[in-house]
Amino acid sequence: MSRGALIVFEGLDKSGKTTQCMNIMESIPSNTIKYLNFPQRSTVTGKMIDDYLTRKKTYNDHIVNLLFCANRWEFASFIQEQLEQGITLIVDRYAFSGVAYAAAKGAPMTLSKSYESGLPKPDLVIFLESGSKEINRNVGEEIYEDVEFQQKVLQEYKKMIEEGDIHWQIISSEFEEDVKKELIKNIVIEAMHTVTGPVGQLWM
């Protein structure tokens, strides 16, 4: 039995990640594809993250970085098992978000990557570009919903994309929504059909 593909959606806040993930789940109906999003706010670490994001509690930046990382590690075994059972996972945010946001707040990228090292490695990362309209819409109740900060996050994403050690697919913000939806669906289907070999380990 061939394994499933680990397909991650990344991008700035309000770039449409969740919408595109849901489009995939609706347009590729199958019992061999599942959706997972981070942070998972139902766990112990997830509830602490939710309190932080909604400004109910404050933590220093190092603790925040570790909380987000621990939240992903809580699901590392689940992800590995699902992929080995032939289940493709569509993941809304992953380690790249953690590294980009931490680096935007001043944490060394190499340090943040070391926390995530060994997580299941994505077969494909789809990065949704944000147009000026979406970026300027990044003002909200949660702590990171700030235009200036989001621009810093974008620069950190670009650094990771340029490294070339991960298969990134950048989706332009200039596409019409129906064109974008169809393009992403085709990219995901191709990734599902061409995945080979064992599950890799991220940043090892």
From Swiss-Prot:
Record-linked Pfam families: Thymidylate_kin (PF02223)
Pathway note: Pyrimidine metabolism; dTTP biosynthesis
A molecular function GO annotation: dTMP kinase activity
Enzyme class: transferase
GO BP terms: dTDP biosynthetic process; dTTP biosynthetic process; dUDP biosynthetic process
Domain of life: Viruses
Residues reported in the UniProt entry to bind ATP: G11, L12, D13, K14, S15, G16, K17, T18
UniProt keyword list: ATP-binding, Kinase, Nucleotide biosynthesis, Nucleotide-binding, Transferase
InterPro entries on file: P-loop_NTPase, Thymidylate_kin-like_dom, Thymidylate_kin_CS, Thymidylate_kinase
Record field: catalytic activity: dTMP + ATP = dTDP + ADP
EC number: 2.7.4.9
Entry's family note: Belongs to the thymidylate kinase family.
Name the record gives this protein: Thymidylate kinase
Native species: Ectromelia virus (strain Moscow)
